[in-house]
Amino acid sequence: MDDIFTQCREGNAVAVRLWLDNTENDLNQGDDHGFSPLHWACREGRSAVVEMLIMRGARINVMNRGDDTPLHLAASHGHRDIVQKLLQYKADINAVNEHGNVPLHYACFWGQDQVAEDLVANGALVSICNKYGEMPVDKAKAPLRELLRERAEKMGQNLNRIPYKDTFWKGTTRTRPRNGTLNKHSGIDFKQLNFLAKLNENHSGELWKGRWQGNDIVVKVLKVRDWSTRKSRDFNEECPRLRIFSHPNVLPVLGACQAPPAPHPTLITHWMPYGSLYNVLHEGTNFVVDQSQAVKFALDMARGMAFLHTLEPLIPRHALNSRSVMIDEDMTARISMADVKFSFQCPGRMYAPAWVAPEALQKKPEDTNRRSADMWSFAVLLWELVTREVPFADLSNMEIGMKVALEGLRPTIPPGISPHVCKLMKICMNEDPAKRPKFDMIVPILEKMQDK
């Protein structure tokens, strides 16, 4: 079968769908020139494939090696329907490539009049200069030039030249396609791992920053007592299900090995510069999580969980809390598969009871509706996002577990919280597990909240 880039170029929707259905395939990977599948589908005008990729979570503002986004390519080639689709999904209309050109530069240069008009109608700047001092309207033929200037002026744009500055994109993050080879290695040679710095150590093991095949990674070395042939076999059997590359809000395990001399089971995952959601909210990272970013994180997590809940059987022993949600370099929240517990890791032990549903604290896992219990955990995450507080921070884990399970301890919603978030929190934290919504039901609610 041809590679995914060829299938997207040629518009082979059936082959693309089959490829996307394999959870080990990463739809945000790049080819040798940094083109993602979405770049190719937009360049070649493959609307059905573009729609499919966006629905599955392709990154809209991903940049190739020349810093072109999919919108640059769709605008250059005059694919008006795709331009409108990308704008609908919040494509950056004034994204700057390595030459300082925005999509409107290309629409004007190639005479894509209707696309140029659409871009201006949606806020594209007509006077922004590239590295060579040229504005988009300088590239347009006379009639289009006058029309665009007139439209821009009516929309309140200042028509004075906006000089090119290297700082146009500073403070924003440039999103590159991921290395497409990383998902090919499930078994990893421990000798190839370069351990750089220990990040953390707790009951379950050690966390290290490392390098592998030229990529920054996180290495998780598990602490397991009485390692045996049976535990080794269970580890090798359970790992492959954690290699989920097909959803942008799920962070896969890249691979695994057993570290000598005493075999320590070891997991490798992508390096996340911001760490976990817990780090971002409670440990003084450099940015503020305002209301709109909080809703964005909530939407990311809901999408990731909606996807995980489609898997049959469910991934067992996955606990949703702010330490098991990682924050990507472009501020995307991703559910970490490296935090899923293995069958041999302290069965029955709860290490983060503040996020656990009361019924899950009271009953055995097999007697609990996992999907409903996850929704309770999500409600606690919503509370954490809007209050910026650690739930029940003044109590020990033992006290939290007992009080939530037996004494009705619940997070209290402080005044001043958005009524929409407040209502959603209450719905998701219904005392009756059967009355809690499913994740695919709350995704559209969060999308509406984000649009506001």
Swiss-Prot record:
Stretches the record annotates as PH-like: 180-212
Main location: other
Membrane topology value: Peripheral membrane protein
Extent of motif Nuclear localization signal: 363-371
Keyword Signal: no
Binding site for Mg(2+): 339
Phosphoserine sites (modified residues): 186, 246
Record remark: domains: The kinase domain is likely to have lost catalytic activity but retains ATP-binding activity. ATP structurally stabilizes the kinase domain and promotes stability of binding to PARVA as well as focal adhesion stability.
Stated name of the protein: Scaffold protein ILK
